Amino acid sequence: MLEEKEKFYYSIGVERERRYTIMIRILLACGIGASTGFMAANMRKIAKQQGLDVSVHAVSKSQVMEYADKIDVLLLGPHFSSEVAKYQNQLNDHGVKVTSIDPDDYAALDGESILETALDLVEE
C-alpha cells in the first residue's frame, strides 16, 4: 500500500516519534459534511501547530467512494458508527482504514485527539 503512494512524501514533525515516507490523507464523512467540515479545519490547525503535513478533508457520506483511491483513512461521524464495517468492506481493496470518531472528541471538536486516532489507525 505505501509504495503506490510514495509521491506524497512527508515526514512527521518533532513532537511525534513516528516517521512516514508518505502524506497521510484523512477523509471525514457525515450526513452532509457540514459538522465534519468544522472538525477538518480544527484538525488541519492542530497538524500545522505540530508540524505535520497531513491532508484532511470533509465530505458527505454519499461522496466517500469518489475519494477511495485518494485517501488512507476514513473517519465517520459518531452518528454513523454502525456503518464502519460496511465502509471498511467497500474500501478494503483500496487499502483504506475506517473507523468512527469518538462521540466525546466529536462534541468537543478535539482535533488533536481525532488526528491521533487517524495516525494510530494508519500504523495498525
Regions found by a protein language model. Give the residues of each.
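Short, well-ordered alpha-helices that flank and scaffold nucleotide-derived cofactor binding pockets
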Residues: 41, 45-49, 89, 116, ...
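Conserved active-site segments centered on acidic
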Residues: 24-61
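Short acidic/histidine-rich motifs immediately flanking catalytic phosphotransfer sites
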Residues: 68-73
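Short acidic active-site motifs
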Residues: 60-64, 83
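Ser/Thr/Gly-rich flexible loops in soluble cytosolic domains mediating phosphotransfer, phosphorylation
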Residues: 25, 98-124
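Short, surface-exposed alpha-helical segments at coil->helix boundaries
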Residues: 37-40, 81-88
